[in-house]
Amino acid sequence: MWKKYKTTLILTTLISLFPMVIGLLLWNRMPDTIATHFGTNNVPNGWSSKTMAVIGIPLFLAALQIFTAVLTFSDPKRQNIGPKMIRLVLWIIPVTSLIVCCSIYANAVGIAVDIGFVSNGIVGLLFILIGNYMPKCKQNYTTGIKVPWTLHSQENWNRTHRLAGWVWIIGGVAMIVNSFLQLEWILFLTIAALVLIPIGRASCRERV
């Protein structure tokens, strides 16, 4: 598996680092302290040094990309992880790195960016993509709803992931709608539903 996806892993890791190049080109135009976290209504509530924003964040995301790949490729049941799911896993972080870092840099140089719209929209699309693949996901230890009940029973795994697929797609639509509304309670409720409903289904199915 390493050999098969070696080129993709190298490419996606370099893409995760690419915002560093953009940040260095904009270095002299950015202040020494940069807003890197935003609350509702695009109000900054977290700041980082320019060095951390330009170099630290892309380095962290590139390291996370490699760590995620190692986990995926080392899974004892990696043969059950389909090619589409592996490509999705390998491309999530680099695409996120590009969009998030470029939004931060744009805001730092005075270009108005609706961070709430961008972040909710990205998360929503990601949830929909994951939800689409959930029912096709076979038992493994890296992706999917990995709780004792689903790992113990193939039938439980299949039923839970069919339900989870719909839940995640609906959650993704809710997040896209929330990119316009930007309400915190929708975010928290959606994430809670995405986690608790599939786990609850797996638990109840095991007890039946």
Indicate where each model-derived feature is located:
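Select subsegments of transmembrane alpha-helices in polytopic membrane proteins
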Residues: 8-11, 54-60, 87-95, 158-169
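Alpha-helical transmembrane segments
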Residues: 12, 46-61, 114-130
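Active-site and channel-lining beta-strand-loop segments
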Residues: 23-55, 143-152
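Membrane-water interface of transmembrane alpha-helices
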Residues: 25-30, 62-74, 129-144, 203-205
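Ordered, amphipathic secondary-structure segments that act as subunit-interaction surfaces
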Residues: 69-117
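Small-residue-rich transmembrane alpha-helices that serve as helix-helix interface/gating elements
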Residues: 122, 185-200
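Membrane-helix boundary/juxtamembrane motif in polytopic membrane proteins
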Residues: 143-167
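Residue-level detector of conserved catalytic or cofactor/ligand-binding positions
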Residues: 198-208
